[in-house]
C-alpha cells in the first residue's frame, strides 16, 4: 500500500469517526433537551421518557437542528421562546461534547 493510499484511508477513517461522534452528540443533546422541555411542560414519569423520544425522533425529519427547534417551539409555546430554546440547545451541545471528550 502506498503512502497516498494510507493517507486516504486515514482521512476516510477520521471522517467516519467525526460523523459518528457528531451523530452521538446530537442524540445526547436531543435527549437532554427533551428532558428539559418535558420538565417545562410538567410531564413526569413515563411521560418524560415518551416526550424525550418524540424530540429525538423529530431530529430525523431533515438534516440539521431546525426540525427539533420547530417541534420545541410548537410544544413550548408560551413556556420558552425560540431564542431561549436555541440558546439552551447550544449550551447543552457544549456540555455534551465536553463530556464526550472526557469519556474518551
Label the predicted regions.
Residues 1-104:
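A charge-rich, low-complexity, intrinsically flexible signal that marks solvent-exposed coils, linkers
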